[in-house]
Design a protein with these regions (language model features):
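The canonical Cys-X-X-Cys-His
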Residues: 61-64, 124
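N-proximal helix/coil linker or "cap" segments that precede and/or mark the start of modular domains
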Residues: 18-32
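Bacterial Sec-dependent N-terminal signal peptides
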Residues: 1-22
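Typically the conserved alpha-helix immediately C-terminal to a functionally engaged Cys/Sec
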Residues: 64-82
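Short active-site neighborhood of thiol/selenol oxidoreductases, capturing the structured segment around
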Residues: 48-62, 87
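Non-catalytic, surface beta->alpha helical segment in thiol-disulfide oxidoreductase systems
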Residues: 112-166
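A short beta-strand-turn-helix
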Residues: 34-52
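Thiol-based oxidoreductase modules, predominantly thioredoxin-like and allied folds used
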Residues: 32-34, 77-106
Length: 169
């Protein structure tokens, strides 16, 4: 009887965890060309006096989806991001199973962004108005428990706003 109860409890917890994962909105467009996505974001950001933040990851990454959800729901973070950045979700899929073209695109993307995959996912790449990499942020430093720390995330974004960067020039 105890064994059946343990099995039932384990299955219930697994089902709950799977549903929680599915509840997060999938924010990565897997059909868009990431290079074009970055170029379009740079054009828009430059016109608005903003920088671009590339959140590199994929719909396969629970922490990537958690961060997108966090930014959307935390009003202070959302305002800081929308006032200073063009935030884009850049899909990364290096697997050969996705096709040779996809693997080649992934390699070119990593080269363009300064090889941010070495930090894990999600990883954030801040680009200035010219498209130059200014900073690569390891997301593990922004985590707190099973989510993200508002204080740490705001510190990261506030340190890389156009105003913060340009005041030091």
């Amino acid at each position: 009887m105890k064994r059946l109860l343990c099995i039932a409890l384990t299955l219930a917890l697994a089902f709950t965890a799977a549903n929680a994962q599915e509840a997060l909105k999938k924010v990565y467009n897997e059909t868009v060309d990431p290079m074009e996505q970055i170029d379009n974001a740079l054009t828009k950001a430059k016109a608005e006096g903003k920088f671009v933040v590339c959140q590199v990851g994929g719909n396969w990454c629970p922490w990537c989806l958690r961060f997108a959800d966090f930014v959307e729901k935390d009003s202070a973070v959302n305002k800081t991001v929308s006032d200073n950045f063009e935030l884009i979700h850049v899909n990364y899929n290096p697997r050969k199973s996705a096709g040779e073209a996809s693997a080649d695109k992934a390699a070119k993307l990593m080269k363009r962004l300064g090889n941010p995959s070495r930090f894990g996912f999600p990883v954030f790449v801040v680009l200035n108005e010219e498209g130059n990499v200014m900073h690569i942020q390891d997301s593990s430093f922004l985590e707190e428990g099973k989510g993200y720390s508002e204080k740490k995330v705001l510190r990261f974004f506030n340190n890389w706003t156009p105003k913060a960067v340009n005041n030091n020039r």
